[in-house]
Amino acid sequence: MMELEQVRVRFVRQDGKELAADETDWGLTAIDGAAAPQYQVYTSDQARGDGSFVTGRRVAARDLEFSAAVMDAGGNAVLRKAALSFFRPGVEYRIYLTYLGTTRWITGELTAFKAPSGPVGEAQTFSAYFLCAKPFWQSVDDFGQDIAAITPCWGWPYMDHPIFGVRAAVANFAREVVFDYDGDVPSYFKATITCDGPVTNPRLTGGDGYVRILTGMQQGDVLTIDFEAARVQMNGENILAKVDRASSFSAMKMGPGENRVSFSADVGENGMHVVLYYNKQYLGV
């Protein structure tokens, strides 16, 4: 029950340094902007008659504010010095917020920091302000899943059926994965493709489109595709120019509900291994 009631935040700076307000050294006193982003709706007046019509809509960048206080005023000097040094302008932070047992993260730029110089005997406080250009909270898990995974089935106690034998593993011969996406807003995934032998022109299909790479692969090659950034790399080298012109990165977006993604190739698809990674996106915490 205490876990569900606890509210905490962990700031991870771009260089890996961390500061937490988890009721150990610092405790959170206020949060603003975490529950929902700002929505913008654009309208234009009707040429005739009353009212307007909607011309556009978007989710704006998110402003976040966190305020915290020292748990034990005896640590004022050390903790204040650490906070003043930790929060720096022009640096990106990953912010992990836990509220009512749910933890999600978001990335933001520090826009302001305040640490009032109050009475030295009272608990020191600070407020940190962030601008999150990508306004949606992300799931902590990236849900990596191999489409062509072999599912092991041996277990204890071991049983060997006299007619059907023993089921040692199950292969996904359909080369398709079906998953239920329960995020609040659509998201894109990243794919890593490897192979056991020669593969020609690998292709991923999902939603209303596909992405096909006009290239050959050999064992040991690693092909990575980022569908949000429209980035394709083979062994770390940019090969975006080898994407089939009929391909559509935007069509590979995952929406709330059931999603299906499959893979194929002109040659060698039986030896392909495709792992999908994605973070679920949420409006708030």
Where are the predicted features?
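Short beta-strand and beta-hairpin "edge-sheet" elements
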Residues: 96-139
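Residues at beta-strand starts and edge strands
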Residues: 5, 60-64, 91, 104, ...
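Surface-exposed loop/edge segments in extracytoplasmic proteins
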Residues: 17-21, 102-106, 209-214, 239-241
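Beta-strand elements of well-folded, non-transmembrane domains
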Residues: 68-72, 99-101, 114, 132-136, ...
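Intrinsically disordered, low-complexity segments enriched in serine, threonine, and glycine
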Residues: 144-285
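Oligomerization/assembly interface segments of phage tail-like spikes and tubes
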Residues: 49-74, 122-136, 259
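Polar/acidic, low-complexity leader/linker segments enriched in S/T/G and N/D
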Residues: 1-43
